[in-house]
Design a protein with these regions (language model features):
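Flexible, glycine/threonine- and acidic-rich loop/arm segments that mediate assembly and lattice contacts
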Residues: 1-244, 251-254, 263-325
Length: 325
């Protein structure tokens, strides 16, 4: 276990800036209605097949005898929570040595942060938040059958069936950029399966967003910046042939993949520990001159009916400047 010590973590002065991708938009967008469970497996809903429209052919004579009864079967869909756990340890020597500064310093400057333990705990919570964001999107489902097997929650991408997937890699023109026509086709898949396209959000990475803006300019489409607010997150909107779609950056998506999801049917599912809560900070037994804590939590994804979402894969990873007109 790595313990924060004086020489391992020198003290510096100056403003602190986080480097790298650290935002969690998917977790934010589905966080309006968090759920709670006391069981590792939980239901994400039931589905049944809608009846197919047809014209009956019943004569007056045939109507004298009632037809055979029929029934509709239902299927339950489930997911699981999984454990997120990290440990933080800072030595007594490090905590008592915050006045020793390394690097370039001016007179009267102080170490930033001033409290190493608080800083390490906060950064560890950021790490867990990024683990949660990645897992809710990319998680591969595993239901444990023994104590030494880890439960793994099913992410939104794995939940989406092939019937709601467009693979651009299989097109004759591959590899191709993402266009709003393709987005409209994905909306059509959701519609044809019986899903609601009213609140759909399109999640893309930075390269794919540039491709969409490039396509919009070529076709005189209008992207309205920050015109919609979902759970405090301002997102852009664009009008397609099948309705208005919100567009937002989601950095945890795999390269070449775009996600259309309905946040109104998704939710994080927490499994709190009695009398402790969830994602709590707890001191661990001392083995020497250091303070040691663990952060523990259990969480899974309620992705709702899978046909309410869609994904587009096989998108080129080239920026518009690298694509031919």
């Amino acid at each position: 276990m790595a313990v924060a010590t004086s020489f391992a973590l020198p003290n510096y002065s100056g403003m602190l800036f986080v480097k790298g991708k650290h935002r969690t938009p998917f977790s934010t967008l589905i966080g309006a209605r968090p759920m709670q469970t006391n069981h590792v497996e939980f239901a994400v809903g039931q589905t049944y097949d809608a009846p197919i429209g047809s014209q009956p052919e019943i004569s007056e004579t045939a109507s004298l005898t009632a037809p055979e009864p029929s029934f509709v079967t239902r299927t339950q869909n489930t997911n699981v929570t999984q454990i997120f756990q990290e440990t933080v340890a800072v030595s007594y020597g490090k905590m008592s040595n915050m006045g020793t500064l390394s690097g370039l310093n001016a007179a009267n400057q102080e170490a930033n942060p001033a409290d190493e333990l608080a800083f390490q705990i906060a950064r560890t919570m950021e790490k867990i938040a990024m683990q949660v964001e990645y897992t809710l999107i990319n998680g591969v489902y595993v239901k444990a059958n023994a104590d030494n097997v880890a439960n793994k929650t099913r992410g939104i991408l794995a939940a989406i069936p092939n019937s709601n997937t467009i693979d651009l890699q299989s097109t004759p023109q591959a590899p191709v950029a993402l266009t709003y026509d393709t987005v409209a086709e994905a909306l059509a898949l959701i519609h044809d399966q019986g899903g609601d396209t009213t609140d759909i959000i399109l999640g893309v990475n930075a390269t794919t967003l540039l491709q969409l803006n490039w396509d919009a300019r070529k076709n005189n489409m209008t992207i309205v910046p920050a015109s919609r607010n979902v759970n405090g997150l301002a997102i852009d909107t664009v009008i397609t042939a099948l309705g208005t779609v919100a567009v937002t950056l989601i950095d945890s998506l795999p390269d070449g993949t775009a996600l259309l999801f309905n946040p109104t049917v998704c939710a994080p599912v927490f499994q709190p520990v009695p009398e402790k809560g969830n994602f709590f900070l707890e001191p661990l037994a001392k083995t020497g001159a250091a303070d040691k804590y663990q952060i523990f939590g259990q969480l899974g994804l309620d992705h709702g009916p899978s046909f309410y979402h869609a994904k587009i894969t096989g998108i080129t990873t080239k920026k518009p400047s690298e694509l031919s007109e």
